[in-house]
Amino acid sequence: MFIYYCKECFVMNKQQSKVRYSIRKVSIGILSISIGMFLALGMSNKAYADEIDKSKDFTRGYEQNVFAKSELNANKNTTKDKIKNEAVVKTSDTSLKLDNKSAISNGNEINQDMKISNTPKNSNQGNNLVVNNNEPTKEIKIANLEAQNSNQKKVNKGTNNYFGYYSFREAPKTQIYTVKKGDTLSAIALKYKTTVSNIQNTNNIANPNLIFIGQKLKVPMTPLVEPKPKTVPSNNKSNSNNSTLNYLKTLENRGWDFDGSYGWQCFDLVNVYWNHLYGHGLKGYGAKDIPYANNFNSEAKIYHNTPTFKAEPGDLVVFSGRFGGGYGHTAIVLNGDYDGKLMKFQSLDQNWNNGGWRKAEVAHKVVHNYENDMIFIRPFKKA
């Protein structure tokens, strides 16, 4: 009985032990689960904290990036203003110069996203100007350059090494010309290679035909063409001209009537001269007919007046029918360039003032303008 009781007790103890063991296992399991959940929760919190930190870092980086971009844009504008302030622009003569002795041509534009580079320099190309705003230091350097421009060139002024530009389109320089006796605006304009209207506008002259001796005029600073050295005439030509002039002096201040009719006519004086050369007078109803009524093949050469023609002493000059009441006029040349401009000549005339028919006007010197319809007859023989 005792044994049975003990056995039963043993069985009960064993069962209780199993129950306690089971409870302990359950407790351990619950504890393990709790610890695991706690650890898992801690790791989750840590991961969440890490995510929050990363999010804060991202937000901070984004704000810094936005700030950096705004600062970069501000630096770009500042840089552009700096470049504009450092560049001195001369609008006149379309020229530019830089304070650091750098020149930028008008056609070059400074871009924001450019890079400084030193391009090898050759005869046709200078250094390139490039700017980089993406450099860490945000500094802009301008290289020395020579801008290529076909209408401009480099200038050195005195001892100062100045690099700039000037336009070839400069205002014409002028000089002062004093009006002299016999001057005209057209002659002055021709002398200084300009126009009458230009001289009028420069000097505020209303009437181009009215200028005064001693008047000061502004004329272009044109280098005057030096006169060509005059060729020394041969002794024979000089002697012949002298002999002709000496003979013509004997005709001066006297009245001549070669044909005995109508007093001292212009035709009479010329016939006296031609008879002295060739032993006969000239034919013609009027003075204007002389070139056409006579055969000059063996005695003279006929010239029609041109702007460059110069008469010689001893030449006959024949005026057209516009003179002498339709009969024309004739005279003997003494000086073919009386005014030094081939505009006037001097001759020995008779009856120029219509006093010959009364024998009241002797042969005398007269200065004439070259007329476009004049004819000159140059004898081969000299007096």
From Swiss-Prot:
Keyword check for Cell inner membrane: no
EC code: 3.-.-.-
Keywords per UniProt: Cell wall biogenesis/degradation, Hydrolase, Secreted, Signal
InterPro entries: CHAP_dom, LysM_dom, LysM_dom_sf, Papain-like_cys_pep_sf, YSIRK_signal_dom
A single BP term in Gene Ontology: cell wall organization
Compartments where located: Secreted
PROSITE patterns documented for this protein: CHAP, LYSM
LysM domain sequence ranges: 175-219
GO molecular function, one term: hydrolase activity
Pfam family, one: CHAP
Signal peptide limits: 1-49
Top-level taxon in the UniProt lineage: Bacteria
Gene Ontology CC terms: extracellular region
Residue span, Peptidase C51 domain: 241-378
Keyword flag Signal: yes
Its job: Probably involved in peptidoglycan hydrolysis.
Annotated protein name in UniProt: Probable cell wall hydrolase LytN
